Amino acid sequence: MEGNQTWITDITLLGFQVGPALAILLCGLFSVFYTLTLLGNGVIFGIICLDSKLHTPMYFFLSHLAIIDMSYASNNVPKMLANLMNQKRTISFVPCIMQTFLYLAFAVTECLILVVMSYDRYVAICHPFQYTVIMSWRVCTILVLTSWSCGFALSLVHEILLLRLPFCGPRDVNHLFCEILSVLKLACADTWVNQVVIFATCVFVLVGPLSLILVSYMHILGAILKIQTKEGRIKAFSTCSSHLCVVGLFFGIAMVVYMVPDSNQREEQEKMLSLFHSVFNPMLNPLIYSLRNAQLKGALHRALQRKRSMRTVYGLCL
């Protein structure tokens, strides 16, 4: 059997095995979550772009995280919503492979962006006097471009290894969308090489970055405890705790899905964890950052004040 043969033309995403009434309820609920994801991240991105006081490295990285979260959710959620309302639940092979590629690309990029954000916090708190030199705009741009490039390059490697396999037999994917581990189960050949490369990638983008983040936050915690003023400690801790919440949610779920040995009993658990990754995590990120960030709340307040002023001026002109 040749490795470049692909015989199936479409794939069935089993998704949620629920009745029509519950499917409509879930579709409505996830539609609200998806709308909140786009709205929350869109507002954060817009405020950062429009408010000059937020043109700093920390918010530059946060704007890219918002872009990733919107893209991540948009890659997975619309098809999942369509499948809830459609009993057929099929997806063509090429769109499925594209969804797998983008899912991996955005996930890896987010891992690396979160590492960059932790490094930014480390420099800001532990080396405040050298911050503007170390975190220059040139360095920030290079870090962001490297994160995006590595994310898409690693995803491309996995897609090339995936497409060399023959897909000639089963067509049912027990998942909410096309995800690489689930799609690999459809292959009619040994997937050992793919599994090894996936595990190696997990070590590179999950274990390694998480270790760097934890080490950086150990130094950050030591520096925060040395801050003399109570206000300074609270401000530094609130900024870092927001990032730690996001890191804990993202890396914790990803490591359970991709690094815990697979079994048939875990398929439903992985489905729920992937749902959290695709729907809840991107929705919660802007909420976590905005609730604990005085500068973001201040920028939003200024934007609303400007809008009210413009309405007043427009009303007077009329």
UniProtKB/Swiss-Prot annotation:
As one GO molecular function, the record gives: G protein-coupled receptor activity
Q: Any idea which UniProt keywords this protein has?
A: Cell membrane, G-protein coupled receptor, Glycoprotein, Membrane, Olfaction, Receptor, Sensory transduction, Transducer, Transmembrane, Transmembrane helix
The UniProt entry's GO CC annotations, sorted and at most eight, read: plasma membrane
Q: Does the keyword Cell membrane apply?
A: yes
Which compartments does it reside in?
Cell membrane
Q: Which residues lie on this side of the membrane: Extracellular?
A: 1-24, 79-99, 158-194, 259-271
For the Cytoplasmic compartment, the record's topological domain ranges are 49-56, 120-138, 219-235, 292-310
Q: Which residues form a coiled coil?
A: none
**Classification via InterPro entries:** GPCR_Rhodpsn, GPCR_Rhodpsn_7TM, Olfact_rcpt
What does the record list as GO biological process?
detection of chemical stimulus involved in sensory perception of smell
Question: Which PROSITE patterns does the entry link to?
Answer: G_PROTEIN_RECEP_F1_1 (PS00237), G_PROTEIN_RECEP_F1_2 (PS50262)
Q: Which cysteines are joined by disulfide bonds?
A: none
Record keyword Transmembrane helix present: yes
* Residues linked to a glycan: N4
Query: TM spans, by residue?
Result: 25-48, 57-78, 100-119, 139-157, 195-218, 236-258, 272-291
> What kind of membrane protein is this, topologically?
Multi-pass membrane protein
**Family per UniProt?**
Belongs to the G-protein coupled receptor 1 family.
The record's listing under PANTHER family reads: OLFACTORY RECEPTOR
Q: What does this protein do?
A: Odorant receptor.
Any idea what this protein is called? Olfactory receptor 2A2
**Organism encoding this protein:** Homo sapiens (Human)
